[in-house]
From Swiss-Prot:
PROSITE patterns: DHDPS_2
Protein name per Swiss-Prot or TrEMBL: 4-hydroxy-tetrahydrodipicolinate synthase
Leader sequence segment: none
Protein location: Cytoplasm
Length: 294
């Protein structure tokens, strides 16, 4: 089962904006040595929206090869076109990914019947597990719990959700409708602790790009019922969780990674580099977490 801290991986670029393959592979290796529980390439944080399909596939292949089955690879495979989502999911399966993360279609705003058709079509096209990515703030639609339940009950390879609704009560609602084996992962670092307390089993995390050890320790503390330690770790991470989203993501987390010497901070337009004031806040948050010496 997918659980724990799963990093929503950034995609390092060189100063010209091309994929930095060496930096990416080194970054993935560092994540594993730090104790991360899984990695998720080419999602929102990986700037999938500004990657070509060829680049998207390239990153998945690099990630699968570097990970070499040591932790699960949950590959992004979303699109607002069902046929494109199927193509990306099939490629991820062929490349050796352990699961795919499929976002609810954005911009075209399908109704619940359209959402069911979209995900059922993908489920029929691949055999690997599918995680529904429900993020109304970006896709402008919210998959109803009943739609999620129907998909889960009717397709064996639809196994759970990355919930980025920031509505903590959804964990209980989804658990009640879908059952205890439905995999619920938080999509928001700020709610990760409470999410687990309500029945979640982990977080697909942005902050773990720079704090994989702390995020994995927080998740482990939750699993062992040690919420005192989990709260202490959460308090260390919370300023960072907030700071990296002051300006449009992933500029914030890429700056933080660059500050720690993990990769460059280049982002692709229309995302732009951070202002100096936000950089200062992130520096302070990194120091608060114990990741950056004052």
């Amino acid at each position: 089962m997918l659980k724990g801290a799963i990093t929503a991986l950034i995609t390092p670029f060189d100063h010209k904006g091309a994929i930095d393959e060496r930096a990416f592979c080194d970054f993935v290796e560092w994540q594993i040595t730090q104790g991360i529980n899984g990695v998720s390439p080419v999602g929102t944080t990986g700037e999938s929206a500004t990657l070509s399909h060829e680049e998207h596939k390239q990153i998945i292949e690099l990630c699968v090869e570097q990970v070499a089955k040591r932790v699960p690879v949950v590959a992004g495979a979303g699109s607002n076109s069902t046929s494109e989502a199927i193509e990306l999911a099939q490629h991820a399966e062929k490349a050796g990914a352990d699961a795919v993360l499929v976002v609810t279609p954005y911009y075209n705003r399908p109704n619940q019947s359209g959402l069911y058709k979209h995900f059922s079509s993908i489920a029929k096209a691949v055999s690997i597990p599918i995680i529904i990515y429900n993020i109304p703030g970006r896709s402008v639609i919210d998959m109803a719990v009943e739609t999620m339940r129907d998909l889960y009950q009717n397709f064996n390879n639809i196994i759970g959700v990355k919930d980025a609704t920031s509505r903590i009560e959804r964990v209980s609602e989804q658990g009640e409708k879908c059952g205890k084996d439905f995999v619920q992962l938080s999509g928001d670092d700020c709610t990760a602790l409470g999410f687990n307390a309500h029945g979640g089993v982990g977080c697909i995390s942005v902050s773990s790009n720079v704090a994989p050890k702390l995020c994995a320790e927080l998740q482990a503390a939750c699993f062992h019922g040690d919420y005192k330690t989990a709260r202490e770790l959460n308090d260390r991470l919370m300023p960072l969780n907030r700071a990296v989203f002051i300006e449009p993501s992933p500029a914030g987390i890429k700056y933080a990674a660059a500050k720690l010497g993990l990769c460059g901070e280049t982002v692709r337009s229309p995302i732009v580099p951070l202002t100096e004031s936000t950089k200062k806040i992130i520096d302070e948050a990194l120091s608060h977490a114990g990741l950056l010496k004052a």
